[in-house]
């Protein structure tokens, strides 16, 4: 059908799944379960929205500074969802609080540093 956007399969790495669990646990412990559930639902909506037009995401500045433009990011403030488009798949690698030292997080998780 003309005008129908391409659909991508969205996959979460084990690390991204663990990120979601850690975010939920942290908010549950220091705030409340209802807010943790709200944030988790919102993050999952952001993740699922990448099934259409994932190219809309920006390049993480920490990686662009290293000349790396194969990863993109989208946001549910203050959280950053870092992903890569491979064929018809969107692979989520990192879901992290953007207030953290993202240079270290990205180096460790994406570059194996």
Spans of model-derived segments:
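Generic structural signal for secondary-structure transition and capping sites
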Residues: 32, 48, 52-56, 79, ...
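Hydrophobic aliphatic residue packing
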Residues: 10, 23, 27, 39, ...
């Amino acid at each position: 059908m003309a005008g129908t956007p391409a659909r991508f399969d969205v996959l979460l790495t084990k690390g991204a799944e663990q990120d979601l669990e850690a975010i939920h646990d942290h908010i549950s412990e220091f705030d409340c379960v209802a807010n943790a559930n709200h944030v988790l639902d919102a993050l999952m909506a952001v993740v699922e929205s990448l099934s259409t037009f994932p190219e809309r995401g920006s390049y993480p500045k920490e990686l662009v500074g290293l000349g790396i433009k194969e990863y993109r990011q989208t946001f549910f403030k203050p959280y950053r969802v870092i992903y890569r488009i491979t064929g018809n798949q969107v692979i989520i690698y990192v879901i992290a609080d953007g207030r953290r030292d993202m240079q270290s997080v990205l180096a460790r998780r994406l570059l194996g540093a």
